C-alpha cells in the first residue's frame, strides 16, 4: 500500500538501554514523553469501564487505551449545519466524555439539504437546540448539551477539543490563538459546495503513541552476526515487513542472550529478510531461535498556531493529480472569507459579477501573502468555480469532510494515529456537468425547498432527475445506513416515479449501534432494513423507500428478476463479503446497470464505480487469496497465537457442530453411510468414527458425564497428544541433515498437568462440558465450585505413548497418507453403528458459533482452548478481546471511515445520475484516515478483446432469440448452425452454469440424442432442475474456433426463451 510523504515516521533514538550494552534505544524518548501530560487531556475525568458490547468493533480500531482517553475528553462542536452535525454524530458515536453543540443561527431551507436532524417544521428554530435531543439519542454514555451564547474564553476553557465549522476567518483566528495558548486542541472544518477545508492544531507538544494503527510486526530470527552493526536475518517464510527507523525488541534468542529483554533498538532495513541493529561484536555467539517484535515508541510532534500556519502552511494531499490545488484553494478560501465578511453572504450561484469579484479578491490576497504562500498566478478558473458553488451545501461533501474531521478529533483526544499536518483541501469538481454550458444562474436560484443547498451547485434539472431515480441498496449495515441518509438528503428516489429498495436479512444487535447510526437501543432484535427505512423517512418524508429482508443470490432471482433489474437506474452495494459483492457485480454486468461499490476495514476504505460500457467491473480484478495456515502447523507445530486460535475454532466445529449434524443425518437419511463412503481420503473413517463416538462411546446420560468427558478431552489434547508427539520427536531430535528438529518455526512443546485450582483449566472444563451437554439437550451448570467438586472423582486413564503412531511433518506427507483407507476398519464401523430404528426420536443439537454472546460459553471455550495450547508451545496467550477478533474473524470498524467513504460514493452517484461519459470524470478512491492517506484514480477501462474484426468487452454479448417465428424453440443443432452461419464461429463447447450442454468430444450417441432437442429441454435434463417461470433468458458460455480452426475468445450468449 502506498502512503503519502506525510505518513513517513518521524524517527527518534536515545541512549544505551542499560550499562554495558552497545545498542541505542528509545529509552530517552519514553522518559521524555512521559514527562508531558498525555495530550493535555483531563486526567480527572471519569474512568468508566468501556462497554465492550457496544464499542466492540471500534475497540479493534482504536484499542482500549485510546478509548479511555476519548472517555476523558469534552468536545465543543460549533456550527450545526450539515458539516457540524456530521462531526457531532461521529464523535458522539465514538464515545467521548461529553459534547456541547454551539450555534447562534436558526434553521433555513438550505440547511435541510444536508442537516439530517433538522426538519421542515424546525425552520426558524435554533439549530443547536433542535439537534440536541436527536444527537443525544445516539449514545447514552455521552451527555450532549446545546449552547447558544458567544464563544468567550471562559466558556472555551472547559473543553479539551474545540471544533469550528462554517466559521468566519476572524472568529477562527481569535479562537485559534486562544486554544493554542491554553493547550486546547483545535479542528477547523469548512465546506463550500464541492469544496472542503480542514485545519488541525493540537499544540506544540502532542504525544503520538501510534502513528499508523497497524498491529506490531514480528518475525522469527534465523541468524544474528557479531558485528558493528550486527545484522539480523529472519526465516525466509515471510518478509519481516519492518521499515528503517522502526524499533524492535528480542525474545527467546539462544546464545546471544544480551538481546533478550533489551530496550527497543532502532533498526536499518537491509533487505526483505535482513536488517542491522547495533554493535553486537561483544555479545555472546548466536546459537539459534529468537523472535523479533516491532515496538511502537511514543513520539512528540509540534503544531503551529492557526495564524502562523495560515502564513506558512503544510498541506496533506487528497489527490496527487491536483498537486497545485491546495495552495490555490488556500488563497481562494481566504478570499471567500473576505467576500462573505464584506457582503454578509457567499457569492451567488453562477453569478458572474460575484465570481469576478472573488477572483479580484484572490489576486489581492495572493499579492500580499508571504513567499511561502504566494503563487505565481492565481488559477482564475478554479476561483470562479469556487464562487459558483460556494453557496451550496452538499450532504456527500459534508459526510467526507465530517468523517475526516471527527477522526482528527479522536486523534486529538487519544494521540492515536498521525494527525493531518496541518491543512487539507478537497474538491469534487468532476461532479459538475460535463457540458460546461448546462448550468445557468436561473437554474441555480433557491426554490425555498429542502434541496436549495444542492440546487445552488447543480441546478434544478439534476434535482428533478435525482427524484425519479430507482435504486437498489443491498445491505443496511454501517455503509447502508450512511447511504440511506445521503440518499434522503440529496433527494434520490424522492420524486414522482422514484424509489429506493433496500434489502437486508439481518436483525439489529447491540454492537451495531456504535456505527450503524440509524438504529437505537430500543431497536435491538428488530429488522435492519425496516428500521433503517423508517429512520430515513423521518429525515426526509418524501423518500420512497421499500424495505426487504432477502439475501441476494440465485435463491432470490424469482424476486429480483428481469423486470426488477430492468426498471432500476443503478445499484449500491453495502455488503460485508466478497461472494455477495461478486454476485451483485455479475447481475449488474448482465443487466448493464451502474454499480457503486465500497468497503471499509478500520480506518481504511475504498470506493469503486462500475459504469456500463465504460469501466471494468468489480470482478475484473481480485485481491490475492488470504494465506492459509498449513494443516500440519495447526495440528502439531503452531508458533503463533493465530495458529492456536484457528485450532480452537476447528475444535469447536469438530466437537459441537459437525458430529451432531452427522448424527442427525445418519438417523434420518438412509443413504448417509453410502454417501459418506464416497468421500475422498480418510474422510469416511473420520465421519463414521465421530458418529460412533457420539452415539455409543461418549454419549452422556447426565451432567456429570459431560464434566467427565470434558476432563478426559482436556487430558487428551493438552497432555497425552503432546506426550505422543514428544515420543515421536524427542526434544533433542535431529533432522537427516543434522540440524535440530525443534528449531525455526517448530517450537518444542511440553505437556500440561491438570490442576482444578488453575482458573484456565477450570474455564476449559466449564465451557466444554456445557457445550457438550447442549449438543445432547442436557441441562448444564454455571456453578464452578460444583464442577470442581465433580472433577475430584473423575478417573483419568493412564496414558503411555505408543510406538508406530504416524505423525505427519508436512502437508505433503498428510496428503499421501490420505490416499490410503483402512477398508476393514470401515466395515467394522458400519457393523457396530446402532441402527437408526433403535433410537426413535433421538436427535442432537448442533451449535453454530456465535462470538458476540458472552453468556453462551462459545468464546469461553475458544479462549481457554487456544491459551492452553499456547501454553503447551510457550506462545504468549491472547486475552478475550484479541481472541474474539481473530477467532471470530471480526472486521474492525469505526463510524468516521464509513461516513467518509459513503461521502465519496455519493459524489460518484451525482456523476452516474447525470450520465457522465468521460472515464476521467469518475474517481475510484482509497483512504486510510490513520496515516492519513488519500488516493484517487480513474477507473480502469473495460478490457477489450477481439475475434475477426469484432471488438468486445465484458459488457457485450450475443443476443439469440430462442423462439422461432413458427413458435417453436431452437434446437441444439439450430443453435450450432446459427453461430456457424451468422458469426462464422464453430462452437466446440457449450455450457450453462456448471452444466455442459455440448462438447466436440461428446459420445456420438449422446450427441445424436441432443442435437434435435430444444435448448431449454437439454438445460433442464442436464442440470436436473426445471426452469422457473421467472426465467426469461439463459446465460450460455461458449468455446469457439474461427474459420482457420484457431481457438478464439468470444462473449457470452443471452438466450431469450420468453
Swiss-Prot record:
PROSITE patterns found in the cross-reference section: UBIQUITIN_ACTIVAT_1, UBIQUITIN_ACTIVAT_2
Superkingdom to which the source organism belongs: Eukaryota
Pfam families cross-referenced by the UniProt entry: E1_4HB (PF16191), E1_FCCH (PF16190), E1_UFD (PF09358), ThiF (PF00899), UBA_E1_SCCH (PF10585)
Sequence repeat start-end pairs: 63-199, 459-611
Enzyme Commission (EC) number: 6.2.1.45
Subcellular location: Cytoplasm; Mitochondrion; Nucleus
TM region(s), chain numbering: none
Annotated protein name in UniProt: Ubiquitin-like modifier-activating enzyme 1
Protein species of origin: Rattus norvegicus (Rat)
Gene name tied to this protein: Uba1
Amino acid at each position: 500500500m502506498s502512503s503519502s510523504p506525510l505518513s513517513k515516521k518521524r524517527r527518534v533514538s536515545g541512549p544505551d538501554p542499560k550499562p554495558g550494552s552497545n545498542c541505542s534505544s528509545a529509552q530517552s524518548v519514553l522518559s521524555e514523553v512521559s514527562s508531558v501530560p498525555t495530550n493535555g487531556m483531563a486526567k480527572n475525568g471519569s474512568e468508566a469501564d468501556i462497554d465492550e458490547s457496544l464499542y466492540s468493533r471500534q475497540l479493534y480500531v482504536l484499542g482500549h487505551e485510546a478509548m479511555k482517553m476519548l472517555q476523558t475528553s469534552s468536545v465543543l462542536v460549533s456550527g450545526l449545519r450539515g458539516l457540524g452535525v456530521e462531526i457531532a454524530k461521529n464523535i458522539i458515536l465514538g464515545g467521548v466524555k461529553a459534547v456541547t453543540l454551539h450555534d447562534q443561527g436558526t434553521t433555513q431551507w438550505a440547511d435541510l439539504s444536508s442537516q439530517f436532524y433538522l426538519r421542515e417544521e424546525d425552520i426558524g428554530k435554533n439549530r443547536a437546540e433542535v439537534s440536541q435531543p436527536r444527537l443525544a439519542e445516539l449514545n447514552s454514555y455521552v451527555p450532549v448539551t446545546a449552547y447558544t451564547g458567544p464563544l468567550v474564553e471562559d466558556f472555551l476553557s472547559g473543553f479539551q477539543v474545540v471544533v469550528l465549522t462554517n466559521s468566519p476567518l476572524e472568529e477562527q483566528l481569535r479562537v485559534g490563538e486562544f486554544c493554542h495558548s491554553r493547550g486546547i486542541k483545535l479542528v477547523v472544518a469548512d465546506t463550500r459546495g464541492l469544496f472542503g477545508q480542514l485545519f488541525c492544531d493540537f499544540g506544540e507538544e502532542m504525544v503520538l503513541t501510534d502513528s499508523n494503527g497497524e498491529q506490531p510486526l514480528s518475525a522469527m530470527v534465523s541468524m544474528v552476526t557479531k558485528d558493528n552493526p550486527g545484522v539480523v536475518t529472519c526465516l525466509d517464510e515471510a518478509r519481516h515487513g519492518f521499515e528503517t527507523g522502526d524499533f524492535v525488541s528480542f525474545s527467546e534468542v539462544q546464545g546471544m542472550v544480551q538481546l533478550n529483554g533489551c530496550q527497543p533498538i532502532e533498526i536499518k532495513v537491509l533487505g526483505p529478510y535482513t536488517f542491522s541493529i547495533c554493535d553486537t561484536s561483544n555479545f555472546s555467539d548466536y546459537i539459534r531461535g529468537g523472535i523479533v517484535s516491532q515496538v511502537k515508541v511514543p513520539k512528540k510532534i509540534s503544531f503551529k498556531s492557526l495564524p502562523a500556519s495560515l502564513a506558512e502552511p503544510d498541506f496533506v494531499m487528497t489527490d496527487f493529480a491536483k498537486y497545485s490545488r491546495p495552495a490555490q484553494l488556500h488563497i481562494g478560501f481566504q478570499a471567500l472569507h473576505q467576500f462573505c465578511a464584506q457582503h454578509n453572504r457567499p457569492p451567488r450561484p453562477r453569478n458572474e459579477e460575484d465570481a469576478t469579484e472573488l477572483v479580484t479578491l484572490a489576486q489581492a490576497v495572493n499579492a500580499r501573502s508571504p513567499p511561502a504562500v504566494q503563487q505565481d498566478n492565481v488559477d482564475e478558473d478554479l476561483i470562479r468555480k469556487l464562487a459558483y458553488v460556494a453557496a451550496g451545501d452538499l450532504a456527500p461533501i459534508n459526510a467526507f469532510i465530517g468523517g475526516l474531521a471527527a477522526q482528527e478529533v479522536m486523534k486529538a483526544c487519544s494521540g492515536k494515529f498521525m494527525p493531518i499536518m496541518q491543512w487539507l483541501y478537497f474538491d469534487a469538481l468532476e461532479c459538475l456537468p460535463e457540458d460546461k454550458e448546462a448550468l445557468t444562474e436561473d437554474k441555480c436560484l433557491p426554490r425555498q425547498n429542502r434541496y436549495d443547498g444542492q440546487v445552488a451547485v447543480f441546478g434544478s434539472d439534476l434535482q428533478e432527475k435525482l427524484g425519479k431515480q430507482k435504486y437498489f441498496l443491498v445491505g443496511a449495515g454501517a455503509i447502508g445506513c450512511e447511504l440511506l441518509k445521503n440518499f434522503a438528503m440529496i433527494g434520490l428516489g424522492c420524486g414522482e416515479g422514484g424509489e429506493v429498495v433496500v434489502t437486508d436479512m439481518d436483525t439489529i444487535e447491540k454492537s451495531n449501534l456504535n456505527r450503524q447510526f440509524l438504529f437505537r437501543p430500543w431497536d435491538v432484535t428488530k429488522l435492519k432494513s425496516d428500521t433503517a427505512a423508517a429512520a430515513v423517512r423521518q429525515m426526509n418524508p418524501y423518500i420512497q423507500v421499500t424495505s426487504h429482508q432477502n439475501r441476494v443470490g440465485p435463491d432470490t432471482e424469482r424476486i429480483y428478476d428481469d423486470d426488477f433489474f430492468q426498471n432500476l437506474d443503478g445499484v449500491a452495494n453495502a455488503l460485508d463479503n466478497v461472494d455477495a459483492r461478486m454476485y451483485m457485480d455479475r447481475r449488474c454486468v448482465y443487466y448493464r446497470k451502474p454499480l457503486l461499490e465500497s468497503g471499509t476495514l478500520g480506518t481504511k476504505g475504498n470506493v469503486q464505480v462500475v459504469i456500463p460500457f465504460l469501466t471494468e467491473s468489480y470482478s475484473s480484478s481480485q485481491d490475492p487469496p488470504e494465506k492459509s495456515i498449513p494443516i500440519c502447523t495447526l495440528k502439531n507445530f503452531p508458533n503463533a497465537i493465530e495458529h492456536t486460535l484457528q485450532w480452537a475454532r476447528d475444535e469447536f466445529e469438530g466437537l459441537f457442530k459437525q458430529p451432531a449434524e452427522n448424527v442427525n443425518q445418519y438417523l434420518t437419511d438412509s443413504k448417509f453411510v453410502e454417501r459418506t463412503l464416497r468421500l475422498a481420503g480418510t474422510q469416511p473413517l473420520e465421519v463414521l468414527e465421530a458418529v460412533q463416538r457420539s452415539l455409543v462411546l461418549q454419549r452422556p446420560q447426565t451432567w456429570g458425564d459431560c464434566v467427565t468427558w470434558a476432563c478426559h478431552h482436556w487430558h487428551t489434547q493438552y497432555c497425552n497428544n503432546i506426550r505422543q508427539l514428544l515420543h515421536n520427536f524427542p526434544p533433542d531430535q535431529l533432522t537427516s541433515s543434522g540440524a535440530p528438529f525443534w528449531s525455526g518455526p517448530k517450537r518444542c512443546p511440553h505437556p500440561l498437568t491438570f490442576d482444578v485450582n488453575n482458573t484456565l483449566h477450570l474455564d476449559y472444563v466449564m465451557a466444554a462440558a456445557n457445550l457438550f451437554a447442549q449438543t445432547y439437550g442436557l441441562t448444564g451448570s454455571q456453578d464452578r465450585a460444583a464442577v470442581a467438586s465433580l472433577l475430584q472423582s473423575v478417573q483419568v486413564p493412564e496414558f503411555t505413548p505408543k510406538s508406530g503412531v504416524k505423525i505427519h511433518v508436512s502437508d505433503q506427507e498428510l496428503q499421501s497418507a490420505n490416499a490410503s483407507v483402512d477398508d476393514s476398519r470401515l466395515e467394522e464401523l458400519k457393523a457396530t453403528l446402532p441402527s437408526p430404528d433403535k433410537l426413535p426420536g433421538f436427535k442432537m443439537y448442533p451449535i453454530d458459533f456465535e462470538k458476540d454472546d458472552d453468556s453462551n460459553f462459545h468464546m469461553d471455550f475458544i479462549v481457554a482452548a487456544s491459551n492452553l495450547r499456547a501454553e503447551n508451545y510457550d506462545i504468549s496467550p491472547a486475552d478475550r478481546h484479541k481472541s474474539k477478533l481473530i477467532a471470530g474473524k471480526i472486521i474492525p470498524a469505526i463510524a468516521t471511515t464509513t461516513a467518509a467513504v459513503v461521502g465519496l460514493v455519493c459524489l460518484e452517484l451525482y456523476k452516474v445520475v447525470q450520465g457522465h461519459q468521460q472515464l476521467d470524470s469518475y474517481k475510484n478512491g482509497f483512504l486510510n484516515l490513520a496515516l492519513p492517506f488519500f488516493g484517487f484514480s480513474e477507473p480502469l477501462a473495460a478490457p477489450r478483446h477481439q475475434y475477426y474484426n469484432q471488438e468486445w468487452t465484458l459488457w457485450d454479448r450475443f443476443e439469440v432469440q430462442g423462439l422461432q417465428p413458427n413458435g417453436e424453440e431452437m434446437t441444439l443443432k439450430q443453435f450450432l448452425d446459427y453461430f456457424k452461419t451468422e458469426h462464422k464461429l464453430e462452437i466446440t463447447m457449450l455450457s450453462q452454469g456448471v452444466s455442459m450442454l455440448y462438447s466436440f468430444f461428446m459420445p456420438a450417441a449422446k450427441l445424436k440424442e441432443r442435437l434435435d432437442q430444444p435448448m431449454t429441454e437439454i438445460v433442464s435434463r442436464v442440470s436436473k432442475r426445471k426452469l422457473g417461470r421467472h426465467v426469461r433468458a439463459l446465460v450460455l458460455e461458449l468455446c469457439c474456433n474461427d474459420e482457420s480452426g484457431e481457438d478464439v475468445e468470444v462473449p457470452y450468449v443471452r438466450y431469450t426463451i420468453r
